Amino acid sequence: MDSGKSRSLETTVKRVYRDLLLPKINTSKKMSTLTNSPSSLEGTPGIKKNSGEMQAEASAERVKLTKSIKEKQNNELEKVALKRKADSEEKLVGKKEAKIMELDNQLVTTVPLPHIPLKNIMDVEMKLVYVDEEDVSYEFAQPNMCLGLQATGQTATTMPPASPRDLTTLPQIDKWLQVALKDASSCYRQKKYAVAAGQFRTALELCSKGAALGKPFEAHAEDIASIASFIETKLVTCYLRMRKPDLALNHAHRSIVLNPAYFRNHLRQAAVFRCLERYSEAARSAMIADYMFWLCGGSEHSVSKLIKLYWQAMIEEAITRAEAFSVMYTPFATRIKPENIEKVKEVFMRTHPTYVDCIYTDTQGLHVLPQTADWSCFPPQQYLLTLGFKNKEDGKFLEKVSSRKLPTYTEHKTPFSPLTREDTVRHMETVGKRILPILDFIRSTQLNGNFHACSGVMEKLHYASLLSRLQRVKEQAQVINQAMAELATVPYLQDISQQEAELLQSLMADAMDTLEGKKSDKERVWNTIQKVGRIEDFLYQLEDSFLKTKKLRTARRQKTKMKRLQTVQQN
């Protein structure tokens, strides 16, 4: 696909995106599941809307309807759970106590990562990524229905209704769009992937111009998003079949922006990252896919098992390929004490003697591994992550992660002056090659942590700004698309405060404007935050300098005083 047509496609489909972004944020965690407690699926606080009273009313109805479904399902859950708990409590209590004692008294620091053959990874992709889904109805909101796993491995997910409407029938797709999709699917099954990709791009243009549903003026944004997301995923599979993962990447990101709740969208993104050898990001996408499958009520253990296998393989590959650092996971069952962290570091130093210049133990958030991840048990088995570096400079920035809310990682000695081109190139190299790979690895086993809700995304947006300064437009667009996909997913992974929700909305809006090439008198949110971080760093440096100077001055005074006393005594 040439660059002109690609830009045209991006422009035409953005109208669909803009209608969807704010409602998606406002209805965070809108799915319900029979294995969740009522408190864990409470919706996040509302976000201020710019689209008028009608949208606000629709959002309120959405929340009420979702809440009623959750309450009904969770009442049924409590009855079943009490019976199960009574039956299994006696059997489990002995084992659980023994496990906790073992983890408290003995630090079990070796978690085996057996090698997973490439054939097994490809089998997972064939069953879950390259599924030929002709029907887009699986992405429409459907109440209390979960289709079983079919012979092809296709499964449907359920979501509570996103808007107050009659759900007895699914929306009718526009007939011309339906014809285009059937023709494209036919070419795909005939292995004419290039032709199929062209027809799916045509279908995407039809969809973005309003030809998505039979009654366009009565269409809901969620329904249009479902169809657009489906087409984006088909483009992903076409480009993967053509062995062009670089072309598939942006489509994978957009499918998540349009429908972050569908687990296959995340798994397809993981497959693209794998083909690009970005294994840490592939591992995180697979982890989110497994969580979304469970969150949406997926009950097929065979599907979850395949996703976890894929997730495990990506972590293994990321660890194997890491050269700058080594890693150790330590299981724990109770609150970690400072003396336990010191013991972990001692064990790490004995186990990895060449990676001891800088040792960082992440105490900020929960880490999970695919071998023991069970989302229905909250919290699942937790792990401490310890990273060791050959070069102290590579891991130095991690100290800021644990001590500051929104740290900046670029050493900008003059925070009130603009960056020169040389500084920009140097910072881009630092962020792109040293900081982001480590943060991506940390997040490959961390669904959510005690960091800020947008942690991990902010760094990518800062990186996009550096790319923009160097006029690397294509790379900038990819990074922003990826950041938008992560922002769209955040409300499903953790509860966010009102302040965080407003920040999320501002980041998403600015990211969209940047992609569209819109200029604004105001600075982008992430650049403003970066400036605040630089000023904070500058103040910290001034404070450190002042305290050091004060300490030296005090020491000199004491020394002078001692000399005077000695002189007096001698005289």
From Swiss-Prot:
Disruption-associated phenotype: Male mice are infertile with spermiogenic arrest and impaired differentiation of round spermatids into the mature spermatozoa.
Record field: compositional bias (Polar residues): 30-42
InterPro entries: SPATA16 (IPR029161), TPR-like_helical_dom_sf (IPR011990)
Superkingdom of origin organism: Eukaryota
GO terms under cellular component: acrosomal vesicle; Golgi apparatus
Keywords (A to Z) from UniProt: Cytoplasmic vesicle, Developmental protein, Differentiation, Golgi apparatus, Spermatogenesis
Renumbered residue ranges of the record's region Disordered: 30-58
Cellular localization per UniProt: Golgi apparatus; Cytoplasmic vesicle, Secretory vesicle, Acrosome
Keyword Thylakoid: no
Tissue: Testis-specific. Expressed in spermatocytes and round and elongated spermatids in the seminiferous tubules.
GO biological process: spermatid development; spermatogenesis
Pfam family name, one: NYD-SP12_N
Family note: Belongs to the SPATA16 family.
Function recorded in the entry: Essential for spermiogenesis and male fertility. Involved in the formation of acrosome during spermatogenesis.
Name the UniProt record assigns to this protein: Spermatogenesis-associated protein 16
Organism, scientific name: Mus musculus
